[in-house]
Amino acid sequence: MNKLSTKLVVAIGIGSALYGILGLWGFTIAPNTFIKPALAILTVFGALFGPVAGLLIGLIGHTVTDTIAGWGIWWGWVISSGIIGFTMGFIQKRVGFSVKNGTYNKGDISYLAITGLIGIVIAIIFAGAFDIIVMGEPFDKIVIQVLGATIADVIVFLVLGLPITIGLAKSNKKHTHLKIEK
């Protein structure tokens, strides 16, 4: 079994706290469904630290949000946040990609966009199915929530998560226009 490094554990703690606290704020778009800018945290931390960190930040952070908010822990949605964080972290495993070192190409950005979008869709469908099957929620309510949450998460991912991650990578790019004279 791989051990988690101290750096990774700290990143998971910070990411979970940020995601958990920022998850308390959002804009209502459907019954119990919000556009939450906190989703960008999963994109950035997943890209920086990988799928395991993304998974744990999503799980822990969403549990923190639900606990502080006082509406009870909705495990289907907690797991869906973990799934989203996990898929956002796939990009970190690509050879040549590093937000920390500013190394990436257009293929990496496309890969992050595609895996992120697929992860969001899978995660939200899972949460909806979980609510219907396990929690006994009405189908028509869940359809509205799933559609609203998918649209909201895609918007946050494309407008905040992806650009912030690319911006961090660009700012860390190791390049210079200076030339060494011989």
UniProtKB/Swiss-Prot annotation:
It is found in: Cell membrane. It is a multi-pass membrane protein. Keywords: Cell membrane, Membrane, Transmembrane, Transmembrane helix. GO terms for cellular component: plasma membrane. The chain crosses the membrane at residues 9-29, 40-60, 71-91, 114-134, 142-162. Its main location: membrane. It holds the Pfam family ECF-ribofla_trS. InterPro entries: ECF_substrate-spec-like, UPF0397. Belongs to the UPF0397 family. This is UPF0397 protein BCAH820_2657. It comes from Bacillus cereus (strain AH820).
